[in-house]
Amino acid sequence: MTTIVSVRRHGKVVMAGDGQVSLGNTVMKGNAKKVRRLYHGQVLAGFAGATADAFTLFERFEGQLEKHQGHLVRAAVELAKDWRTDRSLSRLEAMLAVANKDASLIITGNGDVVEPEEGLIAMGSGGNFAQAAARALLMKTDLSALEVAQTALGIAGDICVFTNHHQTIEELDAAE
């Protein structure tokens, strides 16, 4: 699997992901890019789960963003509806984290669209470790969103065997 973490703080939103691709108990690749920019660089998106499935979802989500002129929540809800009802999509095994200047969302294969509390997303095999680390850092430090995301992902990489230390990080200015 993987670990994706997204943090909103001090007018910034950051999304970071590790680079490990595993097949069973074997590491197949260590530098995969699981976080990218969509819709003219205005949306950050990351995935956890099956890589081929995630690329299909990225493509569909980007289509929804275009269709709805970049409106993140509307595009996420429409993708979730398709994911729930389209037989070919319903078999996909992946989750998406998406964020723009206004919102951060998790889109699941069950058709859920969740806006997490405190603007913190952590998902994938190392998600619980990253979430615990990020929450502690957000509560007890004044670190930037970038520093919190990097540190949380690093801690997840120390603990989770399906997460490595190759980090892909994207950052946007967020709404205050």
UniProtKB/Swiss-Prot annotation:
The keyword Acyltransferase does not apply. The active site is at T2. The keyword Cytoplasm applies. It is an enzyme of class 3 (hydrolase). Allosterically activated by HslU binding. It catalyses: ATP-dependent cleavage of peptide bonds with broad specificity. GO terms for molecular function: metal ion binding; threonine-type endopeptidase activity. It comes from the Bacteria. One of its GO terms (biological process) is proteolysis involved in protein catabolic process. GO terms for cellular component: HslUV protease complex; proteasome core complex. It is found in: Cytoplasm. Keywords: Allosteric enzyme, Cytoplasm, Hydrolase, Metal-binding, Protease, Sodium, Threonine protease. A double ring-shaped homohexamer of HslV is capped on each side by a ring-shaped HslU homohexamer. The assembly of the HslU/HslV complex is dependent on binding of ATP. NCBIfam families: ATP_dep_HslV, PRK05456.1. Belongs to the peptidase T1B family. HslV subfamily. This is ATP-dependent protease subunit HslV. The gene is hslV.
